[in-house]
Design a protein with these regions (language model features):
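Active-site groove signature of glycoside hydrolases
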Residues: 151-169, 190, 195-199, 290
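Short basic/hydrophobic patches in alpha-helices and adjacent helix-turn junctions
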Residues: 274-284, 295, 313
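N-terminal pre-domain/capping segments
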Residues: 5-153, 171-174, 181, 188, ...
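Active-site-proximal loop/turn and secondary-structure-junction residues that shape catalytic pockets
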Residues: 60-62, 91-93, 124-127, 160-167, ...
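Active-site clefts of carbohydrate-active enzymes
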Residues: 256-263, 286-300
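A short helix->loop->beta-strand "cap" motif at the edges of active sites that frequently abuts
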Residues: 116, 192, 283-287
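Acidic/histidine-rich catalytic cores of soluble enzymes
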Residues: 86-87, 177-278
Length: 334
């Protein structure tokens, strides 16, 4: 594995003062901090800061991890080898280690050594938070407690969960909202947010999920909008651009799903320029956007690099437009 030292440049783009972005987005919102101080989106942006930072979701390397070509503890170093200094974990790659204090401490030490920030843990296989059976729902909530604790130990801001349930549209909303609210109450004890990804079933319906998050009525309950997970069923595909737009008001993170690329380096299933205009332009997102490569036509490493390059290219184009407008505004003001 090629190791990049602390001086290795990470993904950033320089440009004019981002404060000028305020007047260029009709829907720009004010400074908003989540519990624990994590910024959801900022109105007053720091000079020379990139429009958004890039993180790496561990799922991008799921084949290497499953084939024992990469150890979970080496993920921070692997991310740094791509010039990425923020990571998003997947619980299935360290399923029995959540309450292993030494293991969590070692992982945190590895991150600190690489200059890598832990953002969140994606949690699967712990039961349905919206299970119609009260006892099963309670068990699912409690099963997630250990990941809340692990996230706190690593310095994450959130755990990502699923809003699985069964029943009618409204019944599933009520059940999932109940489970989410109760888990968020535990998150309060550790300053950890509980965020839901559009991840199959009704959760891939942006309207249903946004309504469910509102119904949960807890400030720690948010979303992790994923560019590609909008298949509600084998017969129903939800509009991904509409879905992202509906989920962004609740966003605590953003997942840039990628599969395949054309000769120009564009993702062929998602128009990244259009998507980032929604995320960054309309909703003024200023947090990390996480690479989640899931394709198979190129290697995982190459897929990660291609996704990063695409994100940077679109980000640079957006920044160039802002710079031009800022210069024009400056001339008009003279």
């Amino acid at each position: 594995m090629t190791r990049m030292d602390a001086k290795t440049p990470v993904s950033t783009t320089l440009g004019v003062d981002r404060r000028c972005f305020l007047g260029m987005s009709a829907s720009a919102v004010g400074v908003a901090c989540l519990p624990g101080g994590y910024p959801a989106r900022s109105r007053l942006l720091q000079p020379w800061a990139p429009l958004f930072e890039i993180s790496l979701a561990e799922w991008s390397l799921h084949r290497a991890l499953r084939n024992k070509e990469l150890d979970h503890l080496d993920f921070p170093e692997k991310a740094r080898s791509f010039g990425i200094a923020a990571v998003e974990y997947v619980n299935s790659f360290w399923k029995d280690k959540a309450r292993d204090a030494k293991y969590v401490a070692e992982l945190k030490k590895r991150c600190e050594g690489e200059g890598t920030k832990s953002l969140l843990i994606m949690c699967d296989g712990e039961g349905a938070l919206g299970d119609p059976d009260e006892q099963k729902r309670k068990t699912a909530i409690e099963n997630h407690h250990k990941w809340v604790e692990a996230a706190a130990g690593l310095g994450c801001h959130s755990i990502r969960v699923n809003a699985q349930s069964s029943g009618s549209y409204e019944e599933q909303q009520k059940l999932a909202a109940d489970g989410l609210h109760r888990l968020c109450e535990y998150g309060d004890k550790h300053a950890i947010n509980v965020i839901v990804e559009n991840h199959g079933g009704l959760s891939s319906n942006g309207k249903w999920l946004s309504e469910t998050l509102a119904l949960a009525k807890h400030p720690r309950c948010g979303s992790l909008p994923d560019f590609g997970n909008f298949r509600v069923s084998d017969k129903e595909e939800y509009d991904r651009y509409l879905g992202i737009d509906q989920l962004m008001p609740f966003a605590r993170g953003v997942s840039a799903k990628s599969h395949d690329f054309d000769e120009q380096g564009n993702e062929i299933h998602t128009d990244y320029a259009r998507m980032l205009e929604i995320v960054v332009g309309k909703h003024a997102w200023r947090g990390h956007i996480g690479i989640e490569y899931e394709g198979s036509k190129v290697s995982e490493d190459d897929g990660i690099r291609a996704t990063r390059k695409l994100l940077e290219r679109v980000r640079d184009a957006m920044q160039a437009k802002l710079d031009e407008r800022a210069k024009a505004a400056g001339k008009d003001g003279k």
